[in-house]
Structure formats: C-alpha cells, structure tokens
C-alpha cells in the first residue's frame, strides 16, 4: 500500500517479515481531521498517511460504490469516471491558524501529506517526512483533465512540484472551506470518504 511505500517495507513477504521481526520502532506524526459528515454532524478521523479533498474524494466514493460491480477493476473504472465527472472547485485554505495567510484556489486536488504516496503509488509529496512535525500541503490547481493525464507520470515519479498550477508549502494546521456557498467538496482519508469540507487538518 501507499503507506508501506513511505516506511520502506518491501513487497516481498519474506523480507517484510524479517524487517518486522527485527523489532525496530519509529515514532511518527499522526494527523487529525475535524470535518463535516454528510448528515451535517461533526466528525473526527486520524490518519498516518495522507488526507486530501477534491477529485480524490470523488474517486474514493466512486471506488467504494463500484467494488461490488467491478471487483479488482473498481479503482481504474472509478478513476476514469471521476476524471470526466469532476469539475475543478474553488476552496479557501489558511495555515497555522492565521486567516490572514489564507488563499483562494481553484483546485483539482489538495493533499495534506504526512506520508509521500497516495492514489495507488502516486508520489504526490516527495519531500514529506513522517516525523518532522509538519504536513506537506500539495495543491494541484486549475488543471484540465488533459493536463492531469499528460503530467500524471511526473506525479507518480515525484518530479511535479515545479510544474505550473502545482503549489507546495508546509504547515502544522490547515483549514479548508468551500469558497462558494453550497459547494460540496469531498474528503479522501486513506481510501475512504468520511465527509466534506469545511475541515481542519492538525498534526
């Protein structure tokens, strides 16, 4: 999985067992998300890897809806469907409890990253560290689906941070709200869609 890639556990079963048997321990950061459930009630989730929102949230919802119908093809089918259904959304982000530092963005996806990988191997946050006390915040901006597909290879390779329409910063607290009234921006937390924005991400 994506988190396993970050911590460096090999796919080979025997090698993975050997590493686990060695008993090495590492203290890592854990993220907390305070968000709004679909019924309007407050929700809380903890995560070790990445929380995100935008197209990633729609993709996860479609994956979970299609698993029974498509089985192992569900992720690819849902991703393709999400790419054509999703319209980029406007959100407002503020960092470290400083509203004056906020920015309005039109986004495809924003990843609040403790780990480096999500989406089945995409190295969305190549500089993220599990124990530095901060999130890496990667905003994939107002990118067309054609651009997204053409640049996806660089996102999987982790060489995308210098691309136009992709921004990167670090923060301990990230607040995200829809910039337009009534807009539904879906969350993605380790492959699940627990709710929608507004949300606060805290290390």
Predicted regions and their residues:
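Catalytic core of DAGKc-family lipid kinases
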Residues: 1-108
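Residues in well-ordered beta-strands of folded domains
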Residues: 32-34, 49, 94, 111-113, ...
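Short acidic, gly/pro-rich beta-turn/loop elements at beta-sheet edges
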Residues: 41, 58-60, 120, 147-148, ...
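A generic structural signal for well-ordered coil/turn residues at beta-strand boundaries
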Residues: 27, 87-89, 106, 112, ...
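Gly/Ser/Thr-rich active-site loops/lids in small-molecule metabolic enzymes
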Residues: 67-74, 115, 120, 126-149
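Glycine-rich phosphate/pyrophosphate-binding beta-alpha loops
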Residues: 52, 56, 111-126, 192-193
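ATP/nucleoside-binding phosphotransfer catalytic cores, i.e., glycine-rich phosphate-binding loops
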Residues: 95-100, 104, 129-130, 139-203
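Residue-level signal for secondary-structure boundary sites
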Residues: 39, 56, 118, 145-146, ...
